[in-house]
């Protein structure tokens, strides 16, 4: 384990947060520009939800390659290579002559930033364990929330004053700066002597055979799928249904995100006081409450800012509680397979979110009920996954006692 000193922790966290921020900003920065982009490419506004799906699916799938590869050759070269792929995709998006080319560019972008999804979980496990690991994961979760806060507001400002293309110009510049920062200042967290050359399928079988890991993976997939579906749908509901201007959409879009920050902060504080099971229950309860808040007005055919944004705020609190807690508990048992475990977590989580947003894009984008229904289903899946985890723990205790 390459333990980070307290003096280096700040730099380590800063570099990790801006590295993750590239992928997160790319996911949501275009949302306020959806009406303008739809007009430019001659497609329905609802079709722009496919941009997020085209981004998230390779973002998830690529992590299955990045994780085991990083266990073999180290974290740093994988991180830098992924950023280069992202920059190529961003250039293509900037000059895309058609909607199909934009989708291809989003696919390449997601394939590149998938490295941040895998490595964000892996490098923290390289350097920390136990309570320190949960603390660092919570700090990272709180830190990275500022990029989704900034992205829609900045995207709305840029698209309103400079056109939607300026969003991709910004992403290109920001991505280039982060790549240079990683090349210059980010040290390798996996020493040569700790690297593993075993076959990929052996690593995956070892990680996936853990019953509790299976439960936490499902929990994270469902939680993030709900978040991503809201991000893909809210812009259409606020901009195309309620006819709000891009600036207003961008500000409303970020209102739920402090809920995630609050949940992440609470997850770290409450874990020591209440214990794992109670913290996970609180997160699950918040997800259910937020989903119900959104679906009830939708059942009456209504789309209201209060229920949509208020329900999402509560849902995001639950997500903020669950993400650092479930990630830490899932990856904790795998100090020598951190890359593979991180890849499975990030890969399946984002693949599931991509498929959920793809399914949402096929539904009516004019209905708040559809969004509430998806969030409700995701919350129920989280409940079932936590039940699975509890039963697995009892099963393991029974085996040890026999």
Tell me what each language-model feature is:
Residues 42, 74, 95-101, 112, ...:
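Helix-breaking motifs and short loop linkers at transmembrane-helix boundaries and internal kinks
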Residues 105-146:
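Cytoplasmic helix-loop-helix junction between adjacent transmembrane helices
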